[in-house]
């Protein structure tokens, strides 16, 4: 067996050759920069903790005490032997490289990057969203409120739920609302609010609403609400998810008066939402699949911008795309047909390309069996 950088290699277990960088044990490491990596493997009995050195001087003493005498080679790993046995730290920088850690070595721990929320900007207008008139009416009411939050106060439209099939324009309408008002839009997926450890998610939610309040009037759009707000009958609620839900309920209830902040939640499955969350939304707006006239408008709009002419009847396309969302029509029919035409080096999109796209969509839409 060979021990190198606190790792034991057994030649009987592996035939791989490990390049061992020559090190000078007499050279003292002046600086070592570490990055928390985690355990060599994971199992359901343990979770990889988030490492933050609250007291950097104390961490340096802790690190030197256990790794004194170890080789500091860039790209290698040091394993904790005390508080978190076998937790790995990668040596990002060692100066000089291949030197020895001593009592005089300065050891720095890289901080974990924290989730930051950024304003989403777009040039989409409500006229770009075809159909969904009920949702547009609600958005115009929200616009009235955000133009003069002090006038509405307790009568403000604070929490609204958008629901409906994927690709029906929920996110697009939220973007158009913020764009037309020129107010900040914070667009996030609910799954990103679940932190690595208990406490992370709640902190992120409070920071999100604090930021939205500071930049009010503003809109918070939370997509995939069912990822955190799933009815308790359908899940065994984990601690990290539970604290996210509680933090979200606190903000939506207005305990912290977030005047000028509107929360729009979005889900494809409103019936799966827990009543505690669903009841906080004052109104639910359904986004419906486009009808014949709406599909015709979408098709004409999309075809007009395509790089190749389309030699196929729009009226026939309206019939063939029945039951499809706007996103399906654009991404899975027209785009697939266009790419097929380009692959065939055809000067235009023809019937055979449309038929190919529709066939491909049907194949991808078929339910897959558990066993092949």
Swiss-Prot record:
Into which family does the record put it?
A: Belongs to the AAA ATPase family.
* Residues binding ATP, per UniProt: 164-171
Residue ranges of the TM segments: none
CDD domains, A to Z: RecA-like_protease
Tell me the organism's taxonomic lineage: Archaea, Methanobacteriati, Methanobacteriota, Methanomada group, Methanobacteria
Biological process terms in GO annotation: proteolysis
Question: InterPro entries per the record?
Answer: AAA+_ATPase, ATPase_AAA_core, ATPase_AAA_CS, P-loop_NTPase
Q: Which superkingdom does the taxonomy of this entry point to?
A: Archaea
Listed under GO cellular component are:
proteasome complex
User: What does the record give as the function of this protein?
Assistant: The 26S proteasome is involved in the ATP-dependent degradation of ubiquitinated proteins. The regulatory (or ATPase) complex confers ATP dependency and substrate specificity to the 26S complex.
The record lists the organism as Methanothermobacter marburgensis (strain ATCC BAA-927 / DSM 2133 / JCM 14651 / NBRC 100331 / OCM 82 / Marburg)
A GO MF term: ATP-dependent peptidase activity
Q: Which UniProt keywords apply?
A: ATP-binding, Nucleotide-binding, Proteasome
Q: What is this protein called?
A: Putative 26S proteasome regulatory subunit homolog MTBMA_c13930
